C-alpha cells in the first residue's frame, strides 16, 4: 500500500536535550490529528516525517526528541497508530535545511514511486507556518515549498501542498508574555530578510517595487509595535537599542540600492535578527554563549 499523505512535523531547538513547550505542542497536535484521522480512515497510507537535527549545545536531534515523545503519547492509547512509515530528517539546524534535507530523505526512503501524488500537511506553531506561507505567497522565487516540490517532481513524485494556512496544522504559540510578543514581532522581519536575500542574488525577474512593498510594510508595522512594547518596560534595553538598527536596514535598502550595499545591510539585519531571536525566545538557554 503506497503512501498518499505525508505529515511533516517541523522541529524546534531543544533545551538541555529536551523538548520545549513549542516542540511538545507540535507533537501533541500530531497525535490529536492522528486520533481524529483514525475515526475516518486507516493511517496505513499516512507517513509522518520528524524534522530537526542536533543544534549547538545539544547531543540529541530534534527529530529523535519529538519521536520519543510521540511514542510516549502513543503508548497511552489502546492501539498503536499503525502508520505507513516514519521518516527522520536529522541533519538540519534551521527551517531552510529542514525542507531541503527532507526532500532528499523522501527520495532516498523508496516509499514514493514515480507518477505518485502525495498530499502534504505541515505541523508547527502558528507563527512559524504563517511565515513559511507568507514568504511563499509574496516571493515564490524564495519560498521553501518550491524547493521541496521541485526536488520531488524531478523524480516523478507530485506533492500536493495547499497554500492556505488553515489547510495545515498551525499550533497556537504557547508564550503570551511581553517577551513572547517581542519574539513574534521580530520574526515578522524574516520576510524582509528573505527579500534582501533574493534581491542580492538577483532572484526576482519582476518589478522590485512590487516585491518589496509588502515585506517592507509588515516589517515597519512590527517595529512600531515593538517600540511600543519596549517603551512600556524597563526589561528590554538591548532590544530597544537594536530596533533603530533594524529600521535603518530597511530604510537604506530601497529598490535602487546597489547589490554590494544590499549585501552589507543584509548581513547587518540577519546578524541582529538572529541575536534577537535567541535573546527573546522564552525557550532559549542563556547559560552558555547563546549569541553565537
Summary of predicted features, one role per range:
Residues 2-292:
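A structural signal for short, hydrophobic/glycine-enriched beta-strand patches
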